[in-house]
Amino acid sequence: QLEAEGFKGIFVGSGAGLPNFMNIKGENSLNIMSSNEYLTRVNLMDAANPLADTPLNIGKHVLVVGGGNTAMDSCRTAKRLGGDVTLVYRRSEAEMPARLEEVKHAKEEGINFLTLHNPIEYIADEKGAVKAAVLQVMELGEPDASGRRSPVPVEDKTVTLDVDQVIVAVGVSPNPLVPKSIEG
């Protein structure tokens, strides 16, 4: 029908999608959230204000997981809120998908970069809040489909960091409700 009316295609804009998580032990602990939720709450809901309707726990030792632009935004936001921020990324800095300018600005603001490490578990305190992250030490293997060298775990080598907030910035996936709501 639409072709007869001169239309050439249809665009379905499903929004930013759903944030990805890593599905690791302890990831449902308190004070672990997606970068989408973190940045939305801080920037649009005044969540850094303890008197706000939905206040956010402001981390003193913040771990941001990921290597893209959103991870850099999350790092810099947490730093500006007073946190000691460490970015953890499973590949080397050269493989980070973030723009070089974003990485440069994050470093200038004092973000600690811990590359070739990947979270494998979060440990919670007696109240259910994250208190530590267990990181697998990685090394680079052969290039994958993206052309970047694949991260490979170094056997029996882990590091544990004390953290009180984790922001997961490992991408988004399409919302499955959109295709399910369209016929044909």
Q: Where are the predicted features?
A:
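A Rossmann-like FAD-binding core segment of flavoenzymes
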Residues: 1-20, 46-52, 58, 80-184
